[in-house]
């Protein structure tokens, strides 16, 4: 897969930083419409120290955060939104179907489905090797940083 935005370019679009930046690169992008990101899940992730020490599983809330960050890239790279911030405003119909563990490559897909003023919605899914790990509907609000 071709890299559209690498790790450093992502940091120019969204304000998240380590240890909370949860996407490594963007491989598909349609401004304001759709974005696909990848996260290489390493055993060295700080959250694995406590979740769980003897059974490492990526927390579901961090999978949904990674999806939200991917959606933020789709929205914040436009000229009208540069320098703004996308806030996580809600989540609906969230389901976890597969555990995400060290060594997995998490594919994060977000399609923006509705925008009304500064509020928007997106349909999101995270997969590992083509298997659904998480699906949800995200709500976000864009505001000045």
From Swiss-Prot:
Signal peptide positions on this chain: none
Organism: Staphylococcus epidermidis (strain ATCC 35984 / DSM 28319 / BCRC 17069 / CCUG 31568 / BM 3577 / RP62A)
Keyword set includes Lyase: yes
Enzyme Commission number: 4.2.1.59
Gene Ontology BP annotations: fatty acid biosynthetic process; lipid A biosynthetic process
GO terms for cellular component: cytoplasm; membrane
Domain of life of the source: Bacteria
Active-site residues (renumbered): 51
Reactions catalysed, as given in the entry: a (3R)-hydroxyacyl-[ACP] = a (2E)-enoyl-[ACP] + H2O
Function: Involved in unsaturated fatty acids biosynthesis. Catalyzes the dehydration of short chain beta-hydroxyacyl-ACPs and long chain saturated and unsaturated beta-hydroxyacyl-ACPs.
Name the record gives this protein: 3-hydroxyacyl-[acyl-carrier-protein] dehydratase FabZ
Major subcellular site: cytoplasm
Homology family: Belongs to the thioester dehydratase family. FabZ subfamily.
MF annotations from Gene Ontology: (3R)-hydroxyacyl-[acyl-carrier-protein] dehydratase activity
NCBIfam families reported in the protein's UniProt record: fabZ (TIGR01750), PRK00006.1 (NF000582)
């Amino acid at each position: 897969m071709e890299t559209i935005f690498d790790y450093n370019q992502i940091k120019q679009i969204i304000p998240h930083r380590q240890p909370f930046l949860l996407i490594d690169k963007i491989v598909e992008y349609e401004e304001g419409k759709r974005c696909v990101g990848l996260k290489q899940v390493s055993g060295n992730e700080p959250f694995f120290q406590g979740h769980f020490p003897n059974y490492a599983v990526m927390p579901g809330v961090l999978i949904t955060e990674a999806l939200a960050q991917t959606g933020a890239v789709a929205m914040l790279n436009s000229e009208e939104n540069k320098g703004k911030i996308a806030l996580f405003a809600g989540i609906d119909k969230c389901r976890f179907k597969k555990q995400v563990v060290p060594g997995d490559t998490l594919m994060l897909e977000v399609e923006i489905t509705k925008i009304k003023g500064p509020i928007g919605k997106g349909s999101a899914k995270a997969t590992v090797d083509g298997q659904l790990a998480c699906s949800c509907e995200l709500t976000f609000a864009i505001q000045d940083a």
